[in-house]
Amino acid sequence: MDLKFSQILLIGYRRPDLTFEQLQVLNLARTKSVHIAIDLSDKVIKQKFEAYLLNYQNNFPNITNLTVDFRNIKMGMVQNIHSAICEQFQMHEKLLIFEDDILFTEQTLINLNAILDHYEKAKDFGAVSAFSPLSAKLLPMSSNSKTWRKSIYFPCWGWGTTRQVWQKYNLRISKQEILDLEDTSKTWNNLNNHQKKVWRGRFYKSHKNPERTWDTQFQFLLFKRDLKVYLPMITYSGNIGFNDANAVNTFGKKPFWVQENVSNLDRRNNIKFVRKIMFRVFMFIDSNTFAGDTRVFKFYGKFKILINKLSNK
């Protein structure tokens, strides 16, 4: 029996080959409804997209409802994502969202969808994400709550949320809202001084230039409303952009802990004792690519480099 998936939103840029690969995965997962929002002003790139999508019914027979929106003007990453999500939430209650450089598998979709369905009505629900900085190819993932955890941080590499949450989102953050976090947010007051300093700086940058980011503003929403993100213990998505010269925001900026070949994850072996051990160790580590509390990862990175140097002598 086919699973009932939430609406899928793909965010496309100048790489039709990556979007095509994502559609192949969505087709294998038997998703029915997909919308693609493509930000470009290049006629040649548009023709390439159209060529890839021309025979979509033959290439992706399981996707029965595929819609594509070619932006007439180049909107930029932030406005394209923001507008596409707002437009889709006018028609759908829930969305799973993937930018074109996000790597994911059929199991990613199944798990994200299951967790979104299960926890969307929780009072503290903010989003669900497929990403964690920790990777273990032998660790099985499931929709079982023991392999998922709540975090105050938002990794946007394959994620989902609801219309109810998104209605509270705003690209524009006022100075007063940032100051009010001290009085209104329990989550904010549980951060240490270092974390507050980092996030406050990022929020002020977004205040001055709302077009700079969109995910920082979503993180602000989570803090402001004391909402949580449901994350896997071990990553179920990755980002190909670190190796892609077309990736404006991520090329050449790969954190040391991001694993390669994430798309080849194979977690079908049910190794229960490994999962139990990993859960106990990693339940205390918050996964967020852009978090202000990554000093533990930085320390580990320096330690790892030192060990590698010593081992090569």
Regions found by a protein language model. Name each.
Residues 1-97, 102-313:
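An acidic/histidine-cluster motif and surrounding catalytic segment
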